[in-house]
Swiss-Prot record:
Listed EC numbers: 4.3.2.1
Main location: cytoplasm
Record-given protein name: Argininosuccinate lyase
CDD domains: Argininosuccinate_lyase
SUPFAM superfamilies the record matches: L-aspartase-like
Compartments, record wording: Cytoplasm
Family membership noted in the UniProt record: Belongs to the lyase 1 family. Argininosuccinate lyase subfamily.
Database matches in Pfam families: ASL_C2, Lyase_1
Any one GO molecular function term: argininosuccinate lyase activity
InterPro entries: Arg_succ_lyase_C (IPR029419), Argininosuccinate_lyase (IPR009049), Fumarase/histidase_N (IPR024083), Fumarate_lyase_CS (IPR020557), Fumarate_lyase_fam (IPR000362), Fumarate_lyase_N (IPR022761), L-Aspartase-like (IPR008948)
Catalyzed chemical reaction(s): 2-(N(omega)-L-arginino)succinate = fumarate + L-arginine
Pathway recorded for this protein: Amino-acid biosynthesis; L-arginine biosynthesis; L-arginine from L-ornithine and carbamoyl phosphate: step 3/3
Entry's Gene Ontology cellular component terms: cytosol
Amino acid sequence: MSNRMWGGRFASGPAEIMEEINASIGFDKRLAPQDIRGSLAHVAMLGKTGILPQADVAAIEAGLKTVQAEIESGAFTFQRALEDIHMNVESRLTELVGPAAGRLHTARSRNDQVATDMRLWVRDTLDALDAQAADLQRALAALALAHSGTVMPGFTHLQSAQPVTFGHHLLAYVEMLGRDRGRFRDARARLNECPLGAAALAGTSFPIDRHATAAALGFDRPTANSLDSVADRDFALEALAAAAIAAVHLSRFAEEIVVWTSAQFGFVRLSDRYTTGSSIMPQKRNPDAAELVRAKAGRVIGALAGLLIVMKGLPLAYSKDMQEDKEGTFDALQTLSLCLAAMTGMVRDLEPVPEVLKAAAGAGYATATDLADWLVRELGLPFRDAHHVTGRLVGRASARGVGLEALSLAEMREEEPRITEAVYAVLGVENSVASRTSYGGTAPANVRAQAERWLAALGDTQ
C-alpha cells in the first residue's frame, strides 16, 4: 500500500531510497501497545468534549482493540510504505471502520503522538528495570548475610589494602543499585507529564481536555508548553544516563567476577549455567556471562552519547533527526534489562571459597593499617609517626619474605621500643575486620545488620 496519509501536497510518491531511510516501522513497531493506549485515551477525550460523535468514538475504540489483538496474535502485517507505527495502525483502522478512522487524528499530530508513545514506553521500562534491580539487590544482600564474616582482601589499585568481609564487598553493590533505582524513579517522575494535545508544535484550536487525557494515561499532568512538548527528549536522555550509570556498576562487578573466577585468584566459583567451554582447550570454564555484561555496558553508554549528539544542534520544535531517539533507547534499556537478569542469576549461583579468600586477605601486609592504628591508640604516637614506624616494619618483613606477624617482638622494638606482645592481636585478619565497627565499616556485626536491613526494606523473596 502506498503512503497517502500526508500526500495531498505531493504530485508523486517518494523515491525507494527515501522510503527506506524514512521508514521507522522496523523498530518503532514495539511502540504499538503504547500507541494504541494513547489513541484510546485521545478518542475517549474527543468524545467527552463533543468534538467527535459517540458513534465514531465507539467505532474507533472497537477498531483499535481489534488492531491491538491482531498485533498481539502476530496476524498484523506491518508495511514499510506506511513509515511508522502510527500510520500502520491508522491504515488498518481505516480498513476496519472506514471514514471514522480519519477523525481519530483530530487535534493531534504525529509529533505529540510519538512523544507520548515514547514517554509511555520509557516509563514502563523504567518500572521494569527498577523491579529487576531490586531482585539483584535481594540476591546480593542474601549472599552478603550468609558471608557477613567471610574474610577477604579489600583492594586499592588492585593491590591488597585492608581485610574486609565478602558480605561487606557485596553490600557495596547493593548501595550502588539503590542509587540506580533512585535515578530510575527520579527519571520516571520527571517524564510523567503528557505531551498529547500539544499537536504539531503550537497546540490546537479544538476545545480538548488535556488534563483528562493525561489522567487516563497515568500521567501526573499535561506538559505546560506545546513547543517543549514535542521538542523534548530529556526524558529519554535522563533514562539513558541512569541506565549508563547502572551499566557501569554492573560492569565493575562483572570485571571482579572475571578476575575472582580465574585460576590465579580462585575466590569464587560460577555455576555451569553461566560459563562456557573452549573449542580447543578442554579444561576451560570461561565466565562469558560476566564478560558480556562488562562489554554490553559500552552499548548503553554509546546510546546515551549518540542521542546527546543527535539533540545538541536541533532548533525547536520537531525535526526528523529525533526519529533517531528510538533504536538507541530501545536497545540500551533492553540491554540493561538483560544484564540485570544475567547478573542476578550469576549471584544466586555464586559460591565463594572462604579458605582462599582468607588466605588472600592476609597477604600483602593487609593488616599494616591495623598496626599503625594500634601504635596511635596504645602508645599515643601521632598517626604520621605511626605510619613511618609501620612502613619500616613492613620493609623488614618484606625483606625476609614473611608476614608482619612473623616478626619477633625484639625486631619490632628496634623500630619502636614501647611495642608490647599485645600488638600481635591486631595482626590477624579476623581481628582486623572485627575492629572496624564504625558505621558503614566491615565488622561482621555491621554487615549482618546492614544485610538484614536491606532484605527487610526490599521484602526478602529469596
